[in-house]
Structures are given as structure tokens and as C-alpha cells.
Curated annotation (Swiss-Prot):
Organism: Pyrococcus abyssi (strain GE5 / Orsay)
Subunit (UniProt): Part of the 50S ribosomal subunit.
Protein's name according to its UniProt entry: Large ribosomal subunit protein uL30
Domain of life: Archaea
Gene Ontology, cellular component aspect: cytosolic large ribosomal subunit
SUPFAM superfamilies: Ribosomal protein L30p/L7e
GO BP field: maturation of LSU-rRNA from tricistronic rRNA transcript (SSU-rRNA, 5.8S rRNA, LSU-rRNA); translation
TM spans (from-to): none
Keywords of the record: Ribonucleoprotein, Ribosomal protein
UniProt-listed Pfam families: Ribosomal_L30
Annotated S-S bridges: none
GO molecular function: RNA binding; structural constituent of ribosome
Family: Belongs to the universal ribosomal protein uL30 family.
Alphabetized InterPro entries for the sequence: Ribo_uL30_ferredoxin-like_sf, Ribosomal_uL30, Ribosomal_uL30_arc, Ribosomal_uL30_CS, Ribosomal_uL30_euk_arc, Ribosomal_uL30_ferredoxin-like
Gene: rpl30
């Protein structure tokens, strides 16, 4: 089962209530926040409902490892370190990321890891309008494997 990275692009002004509730269920309360979700029909329906405020795509293990290492936070706003992951799970961050992508483990298996990654705005900008879909040259909606390039620019 693939994992999807979901990033909130647009703010909270004039958001309709059902979309606002969906974004809250996805834990995307602020712009440039990222969550990792499973590729299931229920999540895909939620993403489709909020498609005018978010972008998403399939994340790979290498990008997930960088995301955990650089932007992962533990309760108390402490960074996730190799030593912490080794102590709790007995593996490196890269091995953990690979197991998460393969579906053998979940991000919840790492104790005290916050479910939301707070990202920097993309270096070089969104390369298009924040109000148009990715297919139309904008930043919103499904972008497939290209989500990895966006996350790299936001780390």
C-alpha cells in the first residue's frame, strides 16, 4: 500500500465548512503543514473534497527519511535523531522510512512522533498560481511522484 504526502497550500479564509472539517480530520490546520496518509478509498475521498486547498502525491522512502530527519518532531518539540530511532526501534531512520512505505510499520510505531510535519515555503516558489490545479500549471491537487520534488524544496 502506497503512502501519500499531503500538503496544505491555501489558508483558512472563506473555506466552506465541510472542507474545513475535512482539513481538520487530515490534521492540516495551517499552510505548509504536511501529513502522511495511506492510499485508501476513504482518504482519497477526503483529498478529493479538499483538492482546492491541498496538494498530494506518492512519497518515496528517501524523501520520507529526509522529512523525518529534518522536520520530524517529538512531543516537547524535540528533533527526531538517529539515536532516538535506534533506541526505540533498533533501526536507522532510512530503514524505518522504507518499512513505513512498504506498509510493514506505521509512523505511529515511533513513540511520541508528532503526526504533522511543519515545512518551509518552497524555495523558488510554487512555479505557478496557488489557485489553479497542478494539471493547469498551478500548485493544487494531485501531482503524483512530483510531490517528492516539492517536499525537497520545502525542507
Amino acid at each position: 500500500m502506497a503512502k501519500l504526502a499531503v500538503i496544505r497550500i491555501r489558508g483558512r479564509v472563506n473555506v466552506k465548512r465541510p472542507v474545513r472539517d475535512t482539513l481538520a480530520m487530515l490534521r492540516l490546520h495551517r499552510v505548509n503543514h504536511c501529513v502522511i496518509v495511506d492510499d485508501t478509498p476513504s482518504y482519497l475521498g477526503m483529498l478529493q473534497k479538499a483538492k482546492d486547498y491541498i496538494t498530494w502525491g506518492e512519497i518515496n522512502a528517501e524523501t520520507l527519511a529526509k522529512l523525518i530527519r529534518k522536520r520530524g518532531r517529538l512531543i516537547g518539540n524535540k528533533p527526531v535523531t538517529d539515536e532516538y530511532v535506534k533506541e526505540k526501534l533498533g533501526m536507522t531512520i532510512e530503514e524505518f522510512a522504507q518499512k513505513v512505505i512498504n506498509g510493514e510499520m506505521s509512523l505511529k510505531d515511533l513513540p511520541n512522533l508528532k503526526p504533522v510535519f511543519r515545512l518551509h515555503p518552497p524555495r523558488g516558489g510554487f512555479r505557478g498560481s496557488k489557485k489553479r490545479s497542478f494539471k493547469e500549471g498551478g500548485a493544487l491537487g494531485y501531482r503524483g511522484e512530483k510531490i517528492n520534488d516539492l517536499i525537497e524544496r520545502m525542507l
